[in-house]
């Protein structure tokens, strides 16, 4: 039997984080959650910040547990959300906690940037990244306009996973996948775009050296070794952007696949050799984010389970206020009720602006259906059926666009993330898109993180061996398309309702 090798993954999301111990032996992997913790926004002075020092402390706490158990880990890897960053001064010290992408300081800044610096069309032509007001390009510009003191004193600018790796090793890098979310990176050159960097009043050297996933950043500093009880463990640049790590974990057999990272927010896309930047991708606001081994993740953001989660929270709050039994609000009960309802009574566009953050999601759905002349949902089951069917129809629209963009056939749709556990939505997606769906893994981000560490250690040759190991370690659930005529008719209704 092959000796088991251990790897330590740090997986940070916008609301919570985890440290995970991954092991690899005999062509299979295993995961063990070491710690789980909240990632809280700090609100002060009308701004929202991330507590980078608290996150560092949580990583140290996870590493201490590993040391206490006497486990030898080969390496450490960190993935996080994109866009946000930390300023470091010339002495190597972090300049205050980083602003969070949810902070309102970027509202209205995009249009000012286009008017005063570089046009919208040219920015997309250079980066191929969808326009979001919180992209790093606009965050830094907003801070420059405001005379931000930390920016003015910054010697280095590090994206969040790179900042945490820096705190562990003392080495500053710029990992490719997370840098691609900034809207400053040019995928054609594989580096930050000089014109965009200069438009912010910065120099290229203020960002770290561009580093590809599965590269060694350095080893734990002596200080961190003393804090944790570990030796000089290597820290690896994995795919620092969590979605890139998740897509690396798609257990595909060849390149002819699409993926759907399904959670509160969903991302549907394809893996390509080159960025797709043209008039149609610009018009439809598709994005080209960095993948591993030189690939591009060509994708589009979708609302995901956000609407369902918000409705369920409202119902729970109402039940609590009225001292009602909450059994009917269990996830399984709600899905069972949804399946009892007539099909396609009510259809919404999940990405309509009215569902972005309404005071009442239930009321927003009612008003949308009333406005479009449809049956207005009344019961929990009717609401859930409406949400799941509408999501599947929106997935179909984007899958149809992806088929037009791809220069290869899309024979399968891989669904990864927490949403892959919703078997009814998986079947609806297969039916709606007319394609075989393979669901799993649920823990895609952590798995991708660990597999890239294994690649850096020399245990894995390339992405396809990585994906084969993942496929060998999991039992994927398969969903074949059914009810074509009914879904075709519903899709026509969706397009009319959507407008």
Which functions belong to the PLM regions below?
Residues 99, 103-116, 451:
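Short alpha-helix plus adjacent loop in nuclease-associated cores
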Residues 1-96, 108, 125, 225-235, ...:
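N-terminal glycine/serine-rich phosphate-binding loop of ATP-dependent small-molecule kinases
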Residues 2, 9, 21, 114-127, ...:
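Active-site core segments that coordinate phosphate-bearing ligands/cofactors
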Residues 72-80, 156, 209, 407-417:
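Short glycine-rich phosphate-binding loop at a beta-alpha junction
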Residues 64, 68-101, 130-134, 161, ...:
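Short beta-strand-loop/turn "lid" adjacent to the catalytic site in phosphate-handling enzymes
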Residues 135-141:
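A charged, well-structured terminal subsegment
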Residues 79-84, 213-214, 262-265, 412-420:
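Glycine-rich beta-strand-to-loop/alpha-helix junction loops that act as flexible
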Residues 45-48, 120-130, 206:
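Short glycine/proline- and acidic residue-enriched helix-loop micro-motifs
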């Amino acid at each position: 039997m092959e000796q088991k090798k251990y790897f330590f993954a740090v997986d940070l999301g916008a609301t919570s984080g985890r440290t995970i111990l991954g092991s690899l032996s005999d062509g299979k992997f295993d995961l063990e959650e070491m710690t789980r913790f909240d990632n809280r926004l700090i609100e002060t002075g009308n701004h929202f910040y991330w507590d980078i020092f608290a996150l560092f402390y949580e990583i140290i706490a996870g590493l201490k547990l590993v040391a206490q158990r006497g486990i030898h880990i080969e390496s450490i890897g960190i993935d996080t959300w994109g866009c946000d960053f930390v300023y470091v001064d010339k002495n190597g010290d972090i300049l205050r906690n980083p602003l969070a992408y949810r902070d309102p300081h970027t509202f209205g800044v995009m249009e000012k940037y286009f008017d005063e610096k570089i046009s919208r069309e040219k920015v997309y032509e250079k980066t191929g990244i969808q326009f979001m007001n919180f992209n790093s390009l606009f965050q830094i510009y907003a801070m420059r306009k405001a005379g931000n003191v930390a920016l003015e004193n910054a010697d280095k600018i590090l994206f969040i996973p790179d900042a945490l790796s820096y705190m562990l090793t003392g080495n500053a890098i710029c990992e490719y996948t997370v840098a691609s979310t900034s809207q400053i990176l040019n995928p054609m050159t594989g580096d930050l775009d000089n014109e965009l960097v200069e438009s912010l009043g910065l120099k290229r050297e203020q960002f770290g050296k561009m580093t590809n996933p599965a590269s060694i950043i350095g080893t734990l500093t002596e200080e961190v070794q003393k804090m944790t009880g570990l030796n000089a463990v290597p820290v690896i640049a994995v795919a620092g952007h969590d979605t890139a790590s998740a897509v690396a974990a798609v257990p595909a057999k060849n390149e002819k696949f699409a993926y759907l990272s399904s959670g509160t927010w969903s991302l549907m896309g394809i893996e390509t050799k080159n960025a797709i930047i043209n008039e149609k991708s610009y018009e439809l606001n598709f994005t080209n984010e960095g993948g591993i081994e030189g690939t591009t993740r060509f994708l589009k953001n979708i609302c995901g389970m956000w609407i369902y989660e918000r409705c369920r929270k409202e119902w729970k709050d109402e039940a609590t206020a009225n001292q009602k039994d909450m059994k009917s609000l269990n996830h399984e009960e709600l899905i069972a009720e949804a399946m009892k309802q007539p099909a396609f009574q009510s259809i919404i566009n999940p990405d309509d602006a009215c569902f972005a953050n309404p005071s009442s999601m239930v009321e927003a759905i009612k008003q949308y259906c009333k406005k479009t002349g449809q049956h207005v949902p009344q019961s929990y089951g009717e609401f859930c059926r409406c949400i799941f069917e509408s999501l599947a129809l929106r997935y179909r629209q984007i899958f149809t666009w992806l088929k037009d963009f791809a220069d290869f056939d899309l024979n399968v749709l891989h669904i990864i993330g927490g949403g892959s556990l919703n078997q009814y939505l998986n079947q609806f997606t297969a039916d709606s898109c007319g394609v075989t769906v393979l669901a799993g893994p649920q823990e895609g981000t952590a798995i991708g993180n660990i597999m890239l560490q294994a690649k850096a250690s020399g245990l894995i040759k390339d992405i396809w061996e990585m994906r084969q190991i993942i496929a060998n370690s999991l039992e994927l659930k398969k969903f074949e398309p059914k009810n074509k005529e009914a879904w075709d008719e519903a899709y026509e209704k969706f397009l009319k309702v959507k407008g």
